[in-house]
Design a protein with these regions (language model features):
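Positively charged n-region of N-terminal signal peptides that target proteins for export
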Residues: 1-4
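Sec/Tat signal peptide C-region and signal peptidase I cleavage site
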Residues: 21-24
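Beta-sheet-rich non-transmembrane sensory/scaffold domains
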Residues: 26-672
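Bacterial N-terminal signal peptides
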Residues: 7-18
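Amphipathic, positively biased hydrophobic alpha-helical segments used for protein targeting
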Residues: 18-19, 254
Length: 672
């Protein structure tokens, strides 16, 4: 994911999917649809046995036919009727605490369990992450558990005590297993549940996702518990996060390329899990994905563009991690989104030039309660998870006919012509159904091709705009945003701005747009960061504006921003920025929201000598791919996480000023 070659993104020009009446919009041309019974009320079929799966893979991937970029889909039909999937069984209650948390392989459960999510409208007091769906936590670099902030940074975990009036470092520990070699591994994100700290990473050396478990002890100490290694391809996305947490259930998505699948060694390229131990070998891996939990649909697979998309759920309620996994077969290009009760995986391939308008995508719905997945054929692709919303029995997705999904840096390529797809969940079925042409709403006024798309569903609205460019920027005006009620066929509102749109986020029921007025990244001192508030009421309109000169965002991921409402109309927001102070000093900027009137509320900055601090001895995961700064609102206290500094603020005449700071730079090199 962090290899240099991956940054060189392909930008192939794709052909139109649209009917002539709507230009190049992502609306598919009229096509013969299967009977309604073929879609509604049905689900995908799993393979009936390991033998059937292996035979299907041999037919699909074993052909010696010449390789064509636009190969026709190859049906994967069973030789005999497939037995229905076994009904989901609840995962047994967590085992009683075991005295020995040693290195024996934990039992793998391939069964279902209904996830108990926190009640809507009552976010936890420990919530400090700007998540997409309330009650669905997302992996990040800092989490709160009781009095403690847990920070994941440069291959280590740190616990910081903020209880009472304290601000002190308590404990630090390697983010990997003692005695293991972390070389060529990236420890990206973290979650916390009832004293269990979960670190998610990816190892190029071992070829899989790593899940590290640590105990947060009563006094704030950190203790290593276990490491699990899941064979997978790289999950990295410049915008999305690999892991989610609902209650005590860990959910993570991992793709698995089948490009090197060997029909005579099928287990070598399928998801498997091992509990790491000293001296672990490949033989320790155990399949957690039986063929009877792999689903497909006739006609959706291309032998030259196929991957296995796996969703794994693990229960964290006991000393042993219990996991189950299911997967769908689809095209390699993907975007995934987690709602409160399902994981959606959107896969797509290049359009077929011989059949313009033929659906080139499929969206899979994988319920979190253990029921079989379902699917719907579609056209185009979303650019990231923020392009999705499941609500009130509908799925809404903003798609582009040139978009290539979110893998690696694909979200930062052109989107092409845009459309809003809105379909009922009841339309998902056995994979033969096609989204109706009428389900797409073309958005021709928003077709800006060579700029990054940023979008978010907020209340009843979809708000989006365009920021940094990657192609030809001449003559393109990106200083505008678009807003529409996604459930209504009302005109799209075009909002004139003083800046491009590099972030869309929520201010309670309303919106904020953030971006710069220049795209010359070498001229930071002449750039200005704009904040524009939008009122989303009877109509969408610009309500307020704030200008911060000589600054740019230091992190464009969703987690860089946080808004704390004080009541229905007022609140405080924080955003990491890089200021023009001579050496690119980092800080968290705070703004006050008063009925959508935005005003400066101070900043908390890193120390002047932060860039010249002692060597931290980093040996692994030494690039901050997920950023290194966050605004943190914990109760009535306000902090800025800035690298190895935690700066606490206090209110002074309506502004946030520094009260004190904690430097938790490690004093010893990371052990290996």
């Amino acid at each position: 994911m962090k290899s240099l070659f991956a940054a060189a993104l392909s930008a192939a020009a794709l052909l139109a999917l649209a009917a002539p009446t709507v230009g190049r919009a992502a609306t598919p041309a009229a096509a013969a649809r299967p009977p309604a019974a073929a879609a509604a009320g049905k689900t995908l079929k799993p393979f009936a046995s390991e033998r059937e799966f292996r035979r299907a893979m041999a037919r699909l991937l074993g052909s010696n036919a010449s390789r064509r970029h636009y190969a026709p889909p190859v049906p994967v039909a069973p030789d005999a009727p497939v037995a229905p999937a076994a009904p989901a069984q609840p995962v047994p209650a967590p085992l009683a605490a075991a005295a020995n948390k040693g290195t024996t392989l934990d039992r793998i459960q391939v069964t279902g369990s209904r996830i108990q999510s926190p009640s809507a409208g009552s976010p936890s007091a420990d919530t400090i992450t700007n998540v997409q769906t309330q009650g669905v936590d997302e992996g990040d670099i800092v989490k709160k558990q009781g009095d403690y902030l847990i920070v994941l940074r440069r291959g280590r975990l740190f616990s910081l005590d903020t209880g009472g009036d304290r601000l002190r470092a308590v404990s630090s520990i390697d983010a990997f297993a003692p005695g293991s070699d972390p070389s060529d591994t990236w420890y990206d994100e973290m979650l916390v549940a009832d004293g269990t700290v979960v670190v998610i990473g990816y190892s190029y050396d071992r070829g899989g996702t790593e899940i590290g478990l640590f105990d947060l002890q009563a006094g704030g100490g950190l203790r290593y518990r276990a490491t699990y290694q899941l064979r997978s391809s790289d999950y990295y996305s410049a915008r999305n996060y690999a892991s989610r947490l609902i209650g005590k259930t860990l959910i993570f998505y991992a793709p698995m390329s089948l490009e090197d699948y060997e029909t005579d060694r099928p287990d070598a390229r399928l998801p498997a899990l091992r509990h790491w131990r000293s001296g672990a070998t490949p033989a320790d891996f155990r399949r957690i994905l039986p063929a009877t939990a792999i689903y497909t649909a006739p006609g959706l697979l291309d032998p030259h563009d196929v991957a296995l998309h796996a969703v794994t759920q693990c229960e964290l309620g006991g000393p042993r991690m219990r996991c189950r996994s299911s997967a769908v077969l689809g095209a390699d290009s993907r975007t995934f989104y987690v709602s409160e009760d399902a994981v959606y995986v959107w896969t797509s391939r290049d359009p077929d030039p011989d059949h313009p308008g033929r659906p080139n995508a499929a969206v899979f719905r994988m319920p979190l309660d253990g029921r079989p997945p379902s699917a719907l054929r579609a056209s185009g692709s979303p650019v990231d998870q923020m392009s999705f919303l499941q609500r009130d029995g509908w799925l809404n997705v903003l798609v582009g006919n040139d978009a290539e999904g979110e893998a690696m840096w694909a979200s930062r390529t052109r989107t092409g012509d845009l459309a809003l797809l809105r379909v009922r969940l009841s339309e998902f079925g056995d994979g033969r159904g096609i989204a109706h042409r009428a389900a797409y709403r073309p958005l021709p006024q928003a077709n800006i091709y060579d700029y990054d798309l940023h979008a978010r569903f907020i209340g009843d609205w979809l708000v989006f705009g365009f920021g940094g460019y990657w192609g030809d920027k001449d003559g393109v005006d990106v200083k505008r945003a678009f807003a529409l009620r996604y459930a209504r066929r009302e005109p799209v509102s075009t909002l004139r701005l003083a800046h491009a749109v590099e972030r869309v986020d929520a201010l309670g029921p309303d919106a904020i747009l953030i971006g710069t007025d220049r795209d010359d990244e070498e001229q930071v001192s002449t750039r200005a960061l704009h904040f524009t508030s939008l009122r989303l009421g009877a109509a969408a309109r610009v309500a307020g504006h704030h200008l911060q000169t000589g600054a740019t965002q230091s992190d464009d991921r969703t987690h860089g921003f946080f808004y704390r409402p004080e009541d229905a109309d007022n609140g405080l927001l924080g955003l990491p920025v890089i200021a023009d102070d001579g050496d690119g000093g980092a800080r968290v900027l705070f703004l006050r929201n008063r009925r959508l009137d935005l005003s400066a509320a101070g900043a908390l900055a890193s120390s002047a000598d932060a860039g010249r601090r002692r060597d931290d001895g980093c040996v692994v995961s030494c690039v901050d791919w997920y950023g290194d700064a966050r605004p943190i609102f914990a109760g009535q206290r306000v902090y800025a996480l800035l690298g190895y500094e935690l700066v606490e603020g206090r209110r002074d005449g309506g502004r946030i000023v520094e009260r004190r700071r904690l430097d938790f730079t490690p004093r010893a090199k990371v052990s290996r």
